[in-house]
Every structure is written in structure tokens, then in C-alpha cells.
Swiss-Prot record:
Pfam family, one: RecA_C
Major localization listed first in the record, in broad terms: cytoplasm
Keyword line: ATP-binding, Cytoplasm, DNA damage, DNA recombination, DNA repair, DNA-binding, Nucleotide-binding, SOS response
Gene label: recA
Species the sequence originates in: Halalkalibacterium halodurans (strain ATCC BAA-125 / DSM 18197 / FERM 7344 / JCM 9153 / C-125) (Bacillus halodurans)
Compartments where found: Cytoplasm
GO terms under biological process: DNA recombination; DNA repair; SOS response
Origin: domain of life: Bacteria
Residue numbers spanned by region Disordered: 328-349
The name this protein goes by in its record: Protein RecA
Protein function: Can catalyze the hydrolysis of ATP in the presence of single-stranded DNA, the ATP-dependent uptake of single-stranded DNA by duplex DNA, and the ATP-dependent hybridization of homologous single-stranded DNAs. It interacts with LexA causing its activation and leading to its autocatalytic cleavage.
Length: 349
């Protein structure tokens, strides 16, 4: 038995010498037992994700119909990372990012790294270089459907390019997944929806880019508009449902409902009010909302406005919600140290 133990110890030392410290270990000896996360910027989504935000070092896919709020969800994650002193990058393959809207959502556009690549290969190579630097906390690729292979761009309009994009995504994710995990970068891929032709039974909807992204994603979010929010006769936003379709770090299939207000993004006050009402932290009597025997307002929109004008009350309610769900605020953003980066295998630097 001792000979086997000695042989195993020698093998482990050899592996660590060749591939770096931490390349193999016993599961219980891992330095970080708890999943390290960064808040999504939406309280309801943090709760639905089960761990208080997006897990670091993982691939996230956000998909849904057009104008459902996919890019808004991703921009809120960028704003949250920047608020905590982290670095973010946005690969704009659709060439459609609105800097004015991003700024309104809290994104520091002066610090945001932006690339508008010409081809899918270029986009993914830029993403790979940024991830391997070890200095990026979140990178957003918008969108997978717009990652057009070079052969398709250089070819004629009517040419058939079957499976090219799927092959590109499969190859890219094989290379990226290890580097994403080592560098603790959150990679958010935004995706569109297509319909499969001739499907008689079941859901005909599918996402472009093949199956690879579905497999490599630790979290998949489906974003859909539920209803239009009105103030009088004016349409002011959308109530949006975000369903956690896949989750490798917590139980899946939870759902978050958020208000996406036009020109403002996800309403923090709306999420606080809805969740606090469910937990009876905020009491609702008829149309009136009250907290600590103080009336917040008559009707949901008035109560939201009160919380916007009184951030102290909103903070107190939010802290009680986080305490109830065991979400102890945002987790600090830290880039890998020079020592950690030196430990990476050469092919992951």
C-alpha cells in the first residue's frame, strides 16, 4: 500500500512540475469551495441564479427574440463589474452598440474596451487574446449569430456555407474554455433565435452557432418580453421574464421578472419592491405599499418612485432581501496575481 502511495505522490509531483501548481488536487483541498460570483446588476436575477450572480470563470449564454432585452442584461453585468473596480470588454459583432444607452445603464464608456470585428474568426481571436491576458473580468460577445465566418464574407451572396459557423464556434470554445476558467473571466455570449423548418411537435425554436455553446455554457438565460408597462397612455417599458434554462452551479429553471424601462434599463426599485412584497418585508394593503409603518405610495409606480427618491430606504429593503436569501452583497473583483498568472500552463497564457 505504501509503495502505491509513494508512486502516486511521485506522479502528483511530476504533474505539478510539468503543468503548474493546482493542476491536480483532491476535491476537498480546493482553496475556494464557494463559487465566486459577480452580481448581474439585477437583484431578481441574482436570486434566480442561486449563487448571487454570474459564476466567475464560466461561459454564459443569453438568448431570446429580438428586442427582448438581451444586450441590456449583458450591459448591466458590465456596469456592475466596473462599479467594483473590474475591467470589461465588449465584442460588438452586430455593430449596433449604443454608447448613450450604455452610459445611462451605468457603464463607464471611457473605460470599456470595445471591438467591432470584420469576421467571426477575428472576433473570437480578439476575445481569446483578452481572456488569456488574465486582466478581464467580463467579456460580452454580441452576438453569436453575427459571427460570420471569413469564407462566407469573401464568398458570393448565394453560396452555400453549411456548418461553417457551428465549426467556428466549436473550435473557438474548445480553445477558450480552459483559458476562461483559469483567468476567472465571465464570458457572456448573446444569441438570437431561429426556427427549425418542418417541426410538427415540440418547440421549433433553436439558437444559431451549433450545439457547442449549449454544452460549454454553465448558465443559459432565456430572455422574453412578457408585457408592456404603461404610465397613463404612455408606454414606459417592458416587464421581462428571464428564465434560467441551464445552471451548473445551482438548481436550474428558476425565473426572474424585471422591469426594463426605456432609456434606463432594468429597474432596481421594481425588483426590490416585487421581491420585498413577496417576502412581506414591504406590506401591501390594497393598492398601498408600506415599509416600517411608513407609506411608500399608492400603486406600484408611485412606490417605485418613492424608493428612487429615497435611496436609504431602498438600500435597507435590499439588504434585508439579500440577508433572507443568503446573498451577502457583491463579491469583490480581483484579477489574478502575477504569481497565479505565472502558474498558468504556457498554452493558456
Amino acid at each position: 500500500m505504501s509503495d502505491r502511495k509513494a508512486a502516486l505522490d511521485m506522479a502528483l509531483r511530476q504533474i505539478e512540475k510539468q503543468f503548474g501548481k493546482g493542476s491536480i488536487m483532491k476535491l476537498g483541498e480546493q482553496a475556494e469551495q464557494r463559487v465566486s460570483t459577480i452580481s448581474s446588476g439585477a437583484l431578481a436575477l441574482d436570486i434566480a441564479l442561486g449563487v448571487g450572480g454570474y459564476p466567475r470563470g464560466r461561459v454564459i449564454e443569453v438568448y431570446g427574440p429580438e428586442s427582448s432585452g438581451k444586450t441590456t442584461v449583458a450591459l448591466h453585468a458590465i456596469a456592475e463589474v466596473q462599479r467594483n473596480g473590474g475591467q470589461a470588454a465588449f465584442i460588438d459583432a452586430e455593430h449596433a452598440l449604443d454608447p448613450v444607452y450604455a452610459k445611462k445603464l451605468g457603464v463607464n464608456i471611457d473605460e470599456l474596451l470595445l471591438s467591432q470585428p470584420d469576421t467571426g474568426e477575428q472576433a473570437l481571436e480578439i476575445a481569446e487574446a483578452l481572456v488569456r491576458s488574465g486582466a478581464i473580468d467580463v467579456i460580452v460577445i454580441d452576438s453569436v449569430a453575427a459571427l460570420v465566418p471569413k469564407a462566407e464574407i469573401e464568398g458570393e451572396m448565394g453560396d452555400s456555407h453549411v456548418g461553417l459557423q457551428a465549426r467556428l464556434m466549436s473550435q473557438a470554445l474548445r480553445k477558450l474554455s480552459g483559458a476562461i476558467n483559469k483567468s476567472k473571466t465571465i464570458a457572456i455570449f448573446i444569441n438570437q433565435i431561429r426556427e427549425k423548418v418542418g417541426v410538427m411537435f415540440g418547440n421549433p425554436e433553436t439558437t444559431p452557432g451549433g450545439r457547442a455553446l449549449k454544452f460549454y455554457s454553465s448558465v443559459r438565460l432565456e430572455v422574453r418580453r412578457a408585457e408592456t408597462l404603461k404610465q397613463g397612455n404612455d408606454m414606459v417599458g417592458n416587464k421581462t421574464k428571464i428564465k434560467v434554462v441551464k445552471n451548473k452551479v445551482a438548481p436550474p429553471f428558476k425565473q426572474a421578472e424585471v422591469d426594463i424601462m426605456y432609456g434606463e434599463g432594468i429597474s432596481r426599485e421594481g425588483s426590490i419592491l416585487d421581491i420585498a412584497s413577496e417576502l412581506d418585508i414591504v406590506q401591501k394593503s390594497g393598492a398601498w405599499y408600506s415599509f416600517n409603518d411608513e407609506r411608500l405610495g399608492q400603486g406600484r409606480e408611485n412606490a417605485k418612485q418613492f424608493l428612487k427618491e429615497n435611496p436609504e430606504a431602498a438600500e435597507e429593503i435590499e439588504s434585508r432581501i439579500r440577508e433572507h436569501y443568503g446573498l451577502n452583497g457583491e463579491i469583490e473583483v480581483e484579477a489574478p496575481s502575477e504569481e497565479e498568472f505565472e502558474d498558468l500552463p504556457l498554452d493558456l497564457k
